């Protein structure tokens, strides 16, 4: 299931956006791009603060049930996973991406005006966890490509849950209607097996804006992976935002509030 809508639509002003069709989708790659290279730490590790008393196993389960809602009778934890661990790590119903809003932009307001800049993107916010590259296009245009590879087992999800229950994996993103080109944004997501090469499911979309509404509004793109099959261990998230080179520097399309989350099926 996929959805593309702007912020005004979510606020109640139901202005219809142009629907996406197969002609708007970029070609499906034969295989996902290589995973990002490990990043060197840029600062010393901060000592951990003392933690408050953790809930008991029974208390942790009750708190999570209150938070998640009624659980399926089939949901059983393997011996290596405890309710206390799930309460601490919160692998479900939260954003698994690092730095989802690197520039601190509020989607409930129009994108703040900004001119061209010669500063590197990494100097414009906190992009920890993102692997960033540039893809040059014809003329003054280019893509800024940002990627993350989410290790679901490292986030304390477990094989039996992913293979047997196959919880929903929800992707959401917001991009600025920058009007730099007809298509200023692309989203590519792959669900990968343990080898990080075998593709189990994928989603690709390149929405075109219709030119209506004020420039700088935020447009939402979303997709839910359901019943994707067993073996998923990684979510490879990639989005592209278009830039245009001008005399004063690079004018960018901004992206914010990117998310990858996992939910139990209802």
UniProtKB/Swiss-Prot annotation:
Modified residues (Phosphoserine): 31, 37, 40, 43
Tissue expression: Strongly expressed in kidney. Weakly expressed in stomach, colon, duodenum and prostate.
Modified residues (Phosphothreonine): 46
Main location per the UniProt record: cytoplasm
SUPFAM superfamilies: Galactose-binding domain-like
Pro residues: bias regions: 27-41
Descriptive protein name: F-box only protein 50
Biological function: Promotes cell proliferation.
Keywords from the named record: Cytoplasm, Phosphoprotein
InterPro entries attached to this UniProt entry: F-box-assoc_dom (IPR007397), F-box_only (IPR039752), Galactose-bd-like_sf (IPR008979)
Compartments in which it is found: Cytoplasm
Residue span(s) of domain FBA: 86-264
Superkingdom of the source species: Eukaryota
PROSITE patterns: FBA
Keyword set includes Hydrolase: no
Organism of provenance: Mus musculus
Biased composition (Basic and acidic residues): 1-16
Chain intervals for the UniProt region annotation (Disordered): 1-53
Cellular component GO terms held in the UniProt record: cytoplasm
């Amino acid at each position: 299931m996929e959805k593309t809508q702007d912020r005004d639509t979510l606020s109640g002003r139901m202005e219809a956006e142009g629907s996406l069709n197969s002609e708007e989708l970029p070609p499906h790659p034969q295989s996902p791009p290589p995973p990002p290279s490990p990043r060197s730490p840029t600062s010393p590790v901060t000592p951990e603060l003392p933690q408050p008393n953790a809930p008991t196993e029974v208390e942790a389960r009750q708190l999570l049930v209150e938070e998640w809602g009624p659980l399926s009778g089939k949901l059983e934890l393997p011996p290596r996973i405890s309710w206390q661990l799930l309460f601490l790590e919160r692998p479900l119903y939260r954003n698994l991406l690092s730095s989802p809003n690197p520039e601190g932009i509020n989607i409930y307001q129009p994108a703040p005006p900004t001119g061209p800049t010669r500063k590197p993107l990494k100097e414009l916010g906190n992009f920890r966890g993102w692997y960033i590259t540039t893809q040059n296009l014809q003329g003054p245009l280019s893509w800024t490509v940002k990627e993350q590879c989410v290790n679901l087992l490292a986030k304390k999800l477990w094989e039996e849950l992913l293979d047997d229950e196959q919880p929903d994996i929800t992707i959401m993103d917001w991009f600025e209607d920058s009007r730099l080109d007809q298509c200023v944004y692309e989203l590519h997501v792959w669900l990968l097996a343990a080898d990080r090469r075998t593709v189990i499911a994928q989603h690709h979309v390149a929405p075109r804006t219709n030119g209506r509404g004020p420039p700088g509004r935020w447009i939402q793109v979303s997709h839910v992976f359901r019943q994707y099959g067993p073996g998923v261990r990684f979510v490879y998230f990639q989005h592209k935002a278009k830039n245009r080179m001008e005399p004063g520097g690079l004018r960018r399309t901004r992206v914010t509030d990117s998310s990858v989350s996992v939910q139990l099926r209802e």
